[in-house]
């Protein structure tokens, strides 16, 4: 069987629809490969796609054929090995294989089909079915944004938006309409001239008359301009209202001395995944980074992920700072407020009840969703149990999970931000 492999660069995305159909068809294979890649890769290593392997048997089209079962009565002329009533042993079918092993002299098979998905496709499968819970519209009056969308073709517009194909098509149609009858007459005149020259070569009068008519018709056709201002077509772009929800995500990370370097790395990887998810799925969202030990500070993205500052542990300092920023910059009646907190669970004993009170009275009534991840292989401490009481009071808007190793990051992340059915 012959195979044709199209290796064109596909610069105009002419095969995009076919590719999307293929990705939908083998979504389960691709999603499984993406999940394995996420657990294998570093979270920061998301700047390229992934190679996906699909077993050859899974890409075969269904085929109806005769099975090997059943009994058949066949006459074999010159048979010297079998007599009536004996059963002929079924031939053993050769099977293809792959991987290391010794060479064989029989068997056929098919290699796995391997293809590459882009970074955009990788992230799409990675964050599929994830969303910020309870995202609602707040204060839509006067906060509409606009996005520019294609709205067909216009006869007027900016020269930079000229549609060349539609312009040439319009010009071609106009030339046909204006010169169609002249071209038909010209064609008839040329045929008549050819007939006269062939059958009546001495009829100079008629020949000269037809040649003059041909010249007049040709001049009339050439006077039709190749391109006219009437032909110009432009891509029409209009501004479409795009009501947007304003959302802010608070990222609170414990960098105290009790956090080992491995624990800090897991926390950073969790927040990198969260940051990537937010920027990938939401056009307009503010992210506030807060680092804390005995005191809390709002920092930028670079310092949040790479600063080496450390100290003691007072978790309430981060919650107090978050509440102050909410009151100052993010009023709850205008913003969808989210928070994600990561810690190893160690905290000054007298501070854990304070954390609970701040959350219950000053933060939870105003946020859409609050997540807490505790990174520890040990038994939970006072902070975890205080947060469990918060979860009982705010079951729909508070969630907590435990991380033990880096391999838990992606499954826990999906559990926290899994799309919920709205009833």
From Swiss-Prot:
Ranges of compositional bias, category Gly residues: 92-107
Disulphide-bonded residues: none
Region (Disordered): 64-109
Signal sequence, renumbered to the chain: none
Highest taxon above the source species: Bacteria
Similarity section: Belongs to the UPF0229 family.
Protein name: UPF0229 protein PFLU_5583
Organism: Pseudomonas fluorescens (strain SBW25)
């Amino acid at each position: 069987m012959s195979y044709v492999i199209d290796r064109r660069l596909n610069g105009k995305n002419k095969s995009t629809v076919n590719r999307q159909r293929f990705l939908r068809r083998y979504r389960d294979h691709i999603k499984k490969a993406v999940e394995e890649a996420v657990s294998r890769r570093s979270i920061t290593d998301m700047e390229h796609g992934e190679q996906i392997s699909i077993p050859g048997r899974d890409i075969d089209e269904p085929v109806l054929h005769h099975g090997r079962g059943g009994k058949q009565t066949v006459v074999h002329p010159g048979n010297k090995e079998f007599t009536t009533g004996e059963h002929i042993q079924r031939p053993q079918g050769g099977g293809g294989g792959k991987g290391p092993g010794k060479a064989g002299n029989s068997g056929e098979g098919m290699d796995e089909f391997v293809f590459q998905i882009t970074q955009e496709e990788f992230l799409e499968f990675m964050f599929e079915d994830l969303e910020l819970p309870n995202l609602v519209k707040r204060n839509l009056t006067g906060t509409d944004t606009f996005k520019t969308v294609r709205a067909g073709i216009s006869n007027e517009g900016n020269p930079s938006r000229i549609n060349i194909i539609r312009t040439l098509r319009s010009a071609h149609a106009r030339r046909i309409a204006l010169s169609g009858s002249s071209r038909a007459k010209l064609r008839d005149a040329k045929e008549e001239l050819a007939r006269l020259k062939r059958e009546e070569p001495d009829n100079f009068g008629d020949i000269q008359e037809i040649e003059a008519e041909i010249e007049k018709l040709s001049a009339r056709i050439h006077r039709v301009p190749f391109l006219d201002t009437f032909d110009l077509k432009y891509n029409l772009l209009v501004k479409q209202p795009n009501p947007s929800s304003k959302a802010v995500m608070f990222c609170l990370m414990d960098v105290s001395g009790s956090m080992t370097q491995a624990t800090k790395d897991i926390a950073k990887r969790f927040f990198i995944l969260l940051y990537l998810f937010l920027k990938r799925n939401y056009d307009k969202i503010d992210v506030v980074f807060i680092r804390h030990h005995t005191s809390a500070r709002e920092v930028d993205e670079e310092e949040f992920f790479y600063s080496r500052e450390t100290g003691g542990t007072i978790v309430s300092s981060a919650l107090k700072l978050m509440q102050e920023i909410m009151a100052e910059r993010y009023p709850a009646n205008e913003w969808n407020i989210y928070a994600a907190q990561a810690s190893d669970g160690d905290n000054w004993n007298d501070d854990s009840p304070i954390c609970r009170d701040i959350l219950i009275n000053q933060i939870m009534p105003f946020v859409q969703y609050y997540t807490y991840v505790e990174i520890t292989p040990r038994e939970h401490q006072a902070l975890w149990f205080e947060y469990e009481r918060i979860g009982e009071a705010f079951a729909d808007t508070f969630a907590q999970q435990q991380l033990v190793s880096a391999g838990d990051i992606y499954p826990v992340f999906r559990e926290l931000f899994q799309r919920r059915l709205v009833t």
